Structures are given as structure tokens and as C-alpha cells.
Amino acid sequence: MEINDLTPAEQRVWRAFSTGATVDFREGGDDEDTAEGAQWGPERSIRATVLRALLLNGPRVPGEVAALKVKGARVTGTLDLRHATVDSIVHLSHCHFTDAPDLSGAHLPYLNLRDSVLPGLMIARARVDGSVRLTRCRFTGVVHLGGSHISGVLFLERARFAAVSETGPVLRLSHVTIEDDLCAPGLRTHGEIRLDGAAVAGSVDLNDARLHHPGNAVLDAQTLVVEGDLLMRRVEATGWIGLRGARIAGRFDLSYSRLSNPDDSALRASSCTIGELWLRKGPPLEGRLNLRRAQVDVLFLEPEVVPDEVYLSSLVYTTLTPHEPAERRLPMLERDAEGYVPHAYEQLATAYRRVGDDHAARLVQLAKQRRLRSTRAWYGRLWGYVQDATVGYGFRPLRAAVWLLSLLAIGSTAYALHHPHALKASEAPHFNPVFYTLDLLLPVISFGQEEAFAPDGWYQYLAYALIITGWILATTVVTGVTRTVSRQ
């Protein structure tokens, strides 16, 4: 391409390229609205074919570093760099593109399109040796970086993505590899972000993001691998967040966030491995919380954040914080959509025992037995009620002592007022109402009173009742103690 074939605006860019000088077409500086770029005239319009020619075979000056640095231009046509190898940095900020650039399979040292307006962007399977900066860009079409390798940071701060279709993604980052951070605080999307299979060596920052895709995925990040933190503080998400099979080495922080996807899951984090999961200081999730088969080292979960329906089957956590009374944690287990999940109760009890709160652990185990009772047949429920009333399933042993003392007082008083007659007056020992009642109550121990005396009338029925009650009490005590000892 000859310089004589270029417009005055293009000639400025051509001449500046060899020395890496910046060409700024803006008239209002940073206050200019790039969205009005469709109205810009030829004095600031650059053909995409000219930019392509510069990047692939532009002039070079010995001792200078060539670079494409343009601000405030209207780029017409498609910037086609498919499978190209570009050795100059590309800096096209505050620009208005008529067509989506296509850099699929390209190899670049650095790409900066900040504050630009684009109808889309294709950088699939590309390699960028430095960073990709899309800060404050506005996209009206799909941005596709799937399969790309970025050696630096991917910047998406306050970028905006408009809906393309009702179900399709607006930002495709599937299987992308980022050797540094994915920095996207204040991101705005109307559609799905697809981050499945991606690998981020640093952290992912989505703080203050506004993600909108009602009834569908706002963030689908299945099998995502993050070596640092996944930060989503103060996020407002309308739609579901999916992290099935993801691995987050650091903290997954949803503090102060509002997640809303009524009648479906708001957070799907099944089969995840997470260092720390923070769900705190926000309103209750509007939608289900799915943590099935997840493994979390530290679960920071405030009871106020838990939604009306959860999935906690096979969830494993080492530490549960903040420390709350068992009465505030148990409702979460009762909201499990799968009904009675014994593993969830065992996990909670283990977490309490780990911090030395044995009382709370016993309350959880008691609640587990009561929940199990509700799943049994009528005779199983009846036996459960007996165990609960007598010894609290073995977790309230003092209750057995109260029953024993109460029955002992009733029997002793009754037989003290009306002595049963001796079976053999010459051989009978002196009658003692207390030990006679103990003989009736205790199935194994004998004080010689029961065999020597026989009550009559309703006192005989009282004796039968004491014997039956004693056997029931002894059986429930043995069952409860066995359950407690085996658990220890």
C-alpha cells in the first residue's frame, strides 16, 4: 500500500507508526463520547485495511520501536488479522469500530482497545505475550477469546456487554489461559459470561459487577481453575452462577452480593474444590444454593444468607464460621431439597466438635435422630418418640435419671401408703418401699423385695407398669449409650 493512496487521517497514522508515536484525533479529550463515533467524518476515519497493512508490513526506522497507537478514530471495515504474527503493540483506544475485529489465531505482543465501542471482537485461539486491555469498552456483539493464551492480565474493568440473543453468551472465555489476573471490577453484562475450562494463574476480580440474564446463566464457569481468589463482592447477579467442578485455591468471596434466580438455582457450585467460600453480609439468596459434593476448607456462611432451599449432600468443609449456636445452623439442614441428608448433620456436628463445642454437636446429633424418625414407619416413629422422651436418643442422659427418680418417688409413695402382703410371712424380709420399687424398675438388679411381696388391686397394675417402664427405660439407655460410644 502506497502512502499516496491514503487519506490525510491515514497518512498521520502511517507516519507515526514507525516511531511508535500516538495519533490522537479526539477534539474533546477524555470527555468525548465514543458512542457517537458513527457521526465522525473522514477527518478521523481509518480503514481497517490500512491498519492491517501497517501491522503486517509497516515502515520501520532503525533505532525506533514501531507501534500502532491511535486514539479517537473511526475504524471502518473489518480489521482482519487472522493467524497473523504481529510484532508491534496494538493500542487503539477511544475508537469506534464499524465491524468486529477478527484476530483469531493471531500472535501479538500486546493489545489495548480501552474505551472503544465495538460490535464484537474475535480473539479465539490467539496468543498475546503481554496483556489484553478492554477497559471500559462497550460491545454490542459477542466477544470471543476462547482458547486464547494471555501471558499478562486480561483487563475488563467497567466494560459493558449488550445482549446478543436471549440464551447465547456475550463474553466467551472458554478454555482461555491467563498467566496473570482477570481484572473485571464493575463489569456490566446483559447475557452470559462463559468461563468454562479456563485457567487463571492469578485472581479473578469481579467486584461490583452487574450481571443480568434472568432465568439463564450469568456466569458459567464449570471446571474453572483459579490459583488465586475469585472475588465477587457487592455483585448483583440476576440469573444463575455455575461453578460445577471448579477449583479455586484461594477465596471465593460473595460478601455483600445479591444473587437472584427465583424458582431455580442461584449458585451452582457442586463438585467444587474451594479454599474459602464467603457468603456473608448480603440478603438471602433468591434461588437454590447447590453445594453438593463440594470440598471447602473454610466455609464462611451466615445463616441470614441461606435461601429457602439448599442442596448439601456430600458437602465437606473443615471449618465453619462464624461460630453460631446449633439452633441457628439447623434450619439450613432442614431446607435441603433432598429431604433427610445424614451426611450434612454429621458434617455440622464434626465442625462443632473440632472447635470444642460438644454441646452444640450433641444438639445436631439429636436433631439428626429426630429428622430420621420422620422418615420411618409408624412403629419406628413410636419407638423414636420413646427414646427421645426418655434419654434424648442418648444425647441427654440426665433425662433418664429424672425419669428414674420420678418413677421411684411415685412407686415408693404408693407402696409406703399401702404395703403389699408378704408371700411367706415367716421368710419375708422387712418391707422397704424404696427398694421394692427399685426391684420393679431395674430389670437386672435384685434386692429380694419383689420375690417376697405381692401387691393386689390397682397396686398390682402399678407394679406391672413400673416393670414395663423399667425395661423400656433400660433399653433406651443402652441404645443411646451404644450410639454415643460408637460415635466417639
Regions found by a protein language model. Give the residues of each.
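Hydrophobic alpha-helical transmembrane segments
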Residues: P342-G356, L404-A422, I445
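Transmembrane alpha-helical segments and their cytosolic interface motifs
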Residues: A377-H418, E427
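N-terminal leader/targeting and pre-domain segments
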Residues: M1-G384
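Transmembrane alpha-helical segments in integral membrane proteins
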Residues: S412, L462-Q488
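Outer-pore turret/helix-boundary of cation channels
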Residues: G147, G197, G245, K281, ...
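Pore-loop/selectivity-filter region of tetrameric P-loop cation channels
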Residues: A389-P397, H419-I467, T476
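Generic, well-ordered alpha-helical scaffold segments in large soluble proteins
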Residues: A351, V364-A367, T413-L417, L441, ...
